[in-house]
A protein has these predicted regions:
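Glycine-rich, basic loop-to-helix element that forms the pyrophosphate-binding segment
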Residues: 62-80
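Short aromatic/hydrophobic "clamp" motif used to bind/position activated sugar donors
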Residues: 85
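Short, flexible, basic/aromatic active-site loop/helix in glycosyltransferases
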Residues: 116, 129-148
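Non-catalytic, C-terminal membrane-associated alpha-helical segments of glycosyltransferases
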Residues: 234-290
């Protein structure tokens, strides 16, 4: 199968200088390496164009208008030629064989994606319900296991299924939780996601997202976490629990009302991606009780 590696970037020149060449060298299985640039204002494109002289399989998709992480990724996946797509943040440093060690899983047609092991960081792969929300905790770190979601910055996925399921939902703009949401849609549609401990990458957590004010990042995380519940959960009892705990959070801190209103406003902007419903909410949760 042909493989495309997509590295998303926005004003990440320093990160590209540190890690892009390592991505190219440690991705010999890839037929193309795509730099998906989201209208950077620094010299990212100048640097990558110079690097293209050395690596013929390095390509550029450059947006003239900033679109946000989800749209940038979706557009690059549509234009990629590979049957398998490797998604990497610009601050990912992959180890040797990180792609190779994941490929055998795709012999199973039910498996549509595999998450990489981020060295030094927990794989928050197990899904459960608590306090009115979908929550996640680490899975086993030494063996392959199912994963509730795949990180949008360190995973490999079947291109056709990524597009079939609607890619990353724009409702989560500008970022956060779009990959978690995609994972929920994949499981609901009857597909399987895995986490592979031998596919090792180092996530340096130097992303350009960190340039945003901390207060704004917390707000977006809270809003999008709520959206992920309202967008995906259909069980009436679980939704009732969410309403009860949301009310309790409002009583303990009125700022949460702003988050609820913002979430509903965002939901009205974007239609829900259409996908099949092979599994119920409780069916999915039961898978992760084992």
């Amino acid at each position: 199968m042909k493989i495309s590696v997509i590295v998303t970037n926005w004003n990440g020149l320093n990160l590209l200088k540190k890690y892009l060449e390592k991505v190219i060298v440690n991705s010999p299985e890839a037929d193309e390496i795509i730099l998906a640039d989201d209208c950077s204002e620094d010299e990212s494109l100048v640097y990558v164009k110079e690097l293209q002289k050395k690596y013929s399989k390095l390509k550029i998709i450059a947006h003239k208008k900033n679109q946000g992480f989800g749209r940038n990724t979706n557009d690059a996946v549509k234009k990629a030629k590979g049957e398998l797509i490797v998604l990497l943040n610009s601050d990912i440093d992959p180890h040797e064989n990180y792609i190779k060690n994941s490929l055998s899983h795709f012999k199973n047609p039910k498996v549509i994606g595999v998450g990489f092991a981020e060295l030094g960081h927990e794989n928050y792969a197990k899904l459960f319900w608590k306090s009115g929300y979908l929550q996640f905790v680490p899975g086993t770190s030494t063996k392959t296991h199912i994963s509730a979601w795949l990180s949008g910055g360190s995973a490999i996925i079947r291109r056709d299924y990524f597009l079939k399921l609607g890619g990353f939902d724009h409702v989560y703009e500008p970022f956060y939780f779009e990959d978690f949401d995609f994972g929920l849609r994949a499981w609901r549609s009857g597909y399987t996601l895995l986490w592979e401990p031998k596919s090792i990458v180092e996530h340096k957590h130097e992303s350009t997202i960190s340039k945003f004010p901390k207060k704004f990042l917390i707000y977006v995380k809270e809003r999008n976490h709520l959206i992920s519940v309202l967008r995906n959960v259909t069980d009436k009892n679980l939704l009732l629990q969410n309403k009860i705990f949301s009310l309790l959070r409002i009583l303990s801190g009125p700022n949460y009302l702003k988050i609820i209103l913002a979430a509903h406003k965002q939901l009205k902007k974007y239609p829900t991606p259409i996908c099949s419903s092979e599994l119920s909410d409780k069916d999915i949760l039961k898978l992760f009780e084992k």
